[in-house]
Amino acid sequence: MLLKSLFLLFLTAIAFASELQIGILTSVPDDKCKVKSKPGDLISVHYEGKLEDGTVFDSSYSRGQPISFQLGIGQVIQGWDQGLTRMCIGEKRKLTIPSHLAYGDRGVGPIPAKATLVFVAELVDIAGSSKHDEL
């Protein structure tokens, strides 16, 4: 029975590790969030990216300028397209992105193949909208 329980726990851990994990670090109250990011929006994001061991591989904060891109059309890794959807301006999230939603088997620059990536990302702006627009 113990062996069966351990096996089920192992399978659960594998399944959980293969999915995008989203943690809310800074939330925005509903009455202050009148618009949320959606696919097709041009958004600006400040972020810091780390490997699982804590090694920082990229940071818009260190450059002093957020990155802007169109959400949901493949301009960035899938983990970002999925994890930055339905965010309020000013919201900050921690995204733990498995390799198949990042750079997969190929890796890029300082990011090794099959790496799980951890980002802290803050939505700075949604182009063409104001904080007072309706959803």
Swiss-Prot record:
The keyword Signal belongs to this UniProt entry's keyword annotation: yes
Main location: endoplasmic reticulum
Signal peptide coordinates: 1-17
GO molecular function: peptidyl-prolyl cis-trans isomerase activity
Subcellular location: Endoplasmic reticulum
Reactions the enzyme catalyzes: [protein]-peptidylproline (omega=180) = [protein]-peptidylproline (omega=0)
Inhibition and activation profile: Inhibited by both FK506 and rapamycin.
Entry GO CC: endoplasmic reticulum
Annotated InterPro entries: FKBP2/11, PPIase_dom_sf, PPIase_FKBP_dom
Keywords from the named record: Endoplasmic reticulum, Isomerase, Rotamase, Signal
Domain PPIase FKBP-type per the UniProt entry, residue ranges: 40-127
Listed EC numbers: 5.2.1.8
One annotated GO biological process: chaperone-mediated protein folding
Motif Prevents secretion from ER per UniProt: ranges: 132-135
Job description of the protein: PPIases accelerate the folding of proteins. It catalyzes the cis-trans isomerization of proline imidic peptide bonds in oligopeptides.
Stated family: Belongs to the FKBP-type PPIase family. FKBP2 subfamily.
Protein name in UniProt: FK506-binding protein 2
